[in-house]
Amino acid sequence: MSTISAALVMQLRERTGAGMMECKKFLIATNGDIEQAIIEMRKAGQAKADKKADRVAAEGIIVIARSSDERTAVMLEINSETDFVARDENFTNFANAVADVALTSLPKNIEDLSNQALSSGATVEQARQELVAKIGENIKLRRLEKMHCDGVIGYYLHGSRIGVMVALKNGSEALAKDIAMHVAASKPMVVSRDQVPAEAIENEREIFTAQAKESGKPQEIIDKMIDGRINKFIDEVSLLGQPYVKDPNIKVGQLLKEKNAEVISFVRYEVGEGIEKKEDNFVEEVMAQVRT
């Protein structure tokens, strides 16, 4: 890439908090690859924080339905264009009805779910289209997760924007719900440290190595520093290694051991994560209307 646009520089600045010239320098070095630029800036200690990385721009709700025996559950993300519609009773009623149908039919995927019949007789897709026509916004069934276990499934909804399901062995529903609440707050990547992807560890090792070399300390000390930071990183992203949100003096793994319980799996959804929403440019909209 021969030139780096001002818009790209601004985007990197918003995400890292670094100066304009630093952002441009790293973008040039990475040929305009913003994600690689962030990694290189972290290595050099320039990125204050990837402030915008976790920001998402999509509206909607998370809904969960669970069977009466607490062994089967489904979770859905259903998107709308605005938060106003996401709070609309027609929208929330539709979302909950779809979750109930998903629990009953356990569809293979969203397409399969769309063909299932609601109590009204209409299919999910027909009801979606009717709702779109009624409220004037696009509505999308974005994703579906099914969970089943021989133990107990606990779930937690933080408002309607974050949802978590946890499958627990040898534990109570109350404990499963507490763990789900912890997952909602602490966002672990995996259950246990052995499940952390090797690629994620290697990426962090490269960053820590680059940072440690700047200290000027002997290689033996640097190696110990890196190992310590890697272990800390693994604990931070592993559910069992995290301090329990209700009692930070103990880790989740210790709590489960005391309760003789085991987390089989968990799933965490947050509305809009991974979706980039087009920002409105009202000046351009008005000018386009004038030109027509």
UniProtKB/Swiss-Prot annotation:
Principal location class: cytoplasm
One MF annotation (Gene Ontology) recorded for this entry: translation elongation factor activity
Entry's localization field: Cytoplasm
Chain spans, region Involved in Mg(2+) ion dislocation from EF-Tu: 82-85
Family affiliation: Belongs to the EF-Ts family.
Name this protein carries in UniProt: Elongation factor Ts
SUPFAM superfamilies: Elongation factor Ts (EF-Ts), dimerisation domain, UBA-like
GO cellular component term, pick one: cytoplasm
One Pfam family hit: EF_TS
Keywords, sorted A to Z: Cytoplasm, Elongation factor, Protein biosynthesis
Chain's role: Associates with the EF-Tu.GDP complex and induces the exchange of GDP to GTP. It remains bound to the aminoacyl-tRNA.EF-Tu.GTP complex up to the GTP hydrolysis stage on the ribosome.
